[in-house]
Amino acid sequence: QIGLRGETVDAFSDDLPLYDRLFLGGSKSIRGVDFREIAPRIYAHENKKGRYVAWGGQTSWCMNMEYSVPVVKMLRVAVFSDLGSVGEDDFDFDTAWFCWSVGLGLRLDLEQFPIRLDFATPVVDPDESVDEKVFTFSVGYDF
């Protein structure tokens, strides 16, 4: 299976609210990173300590590739690769926040109730200080 998705949003004012901004990461986009982790960041102060937090962007694209092999009637083993990026402005296809992950998964095909268990790790991660492996559990169809 191959899935490709692209989005862009624009605002009538100078600022786009946080709830309308775009992020990638998690079981429905890039499975090798945590939910909403891939996005442009801003520096936030909290309790006299500062850190960078994901602020979101206005353009995103994501590509998911997956190949699965049946083991028994209701169980498949999958190998997958996810990649994508989030741009800060509308129609901004900058690759500064590009991420690519690979992983393995199990697919349990129950009638009307498919279950996905995935284990993935980033190959290219814009936040290189994070060395993580992510396990995701989801119910529903692939991307």
Where are these predicted regions, by residue range?
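Membrane-spanning beta-strand positions in outer-membrane beta-barrel proteins
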Residues: 1, 76, 114-116
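Membrane-embedded beta-strand positions in outer-membrane beta-barrel channels/transporters
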Residues: 1-3, 62-64, 101-105, 136-138
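Outer-membrane beta-barrel translocator/channel fold
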Residues: 7-24, 115, 121-134
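C-terminal outer-membrane beta-barrel translocator/porin domains of Gram-negative envelope proteins
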Residues: 1-71, 79-83, 87-89
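Strand-loop-strand
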Residues: 89, 95-104, 108-110
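Outer-membrane beta-barrel "beta-signal"
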Residues: 104-115, 132-143
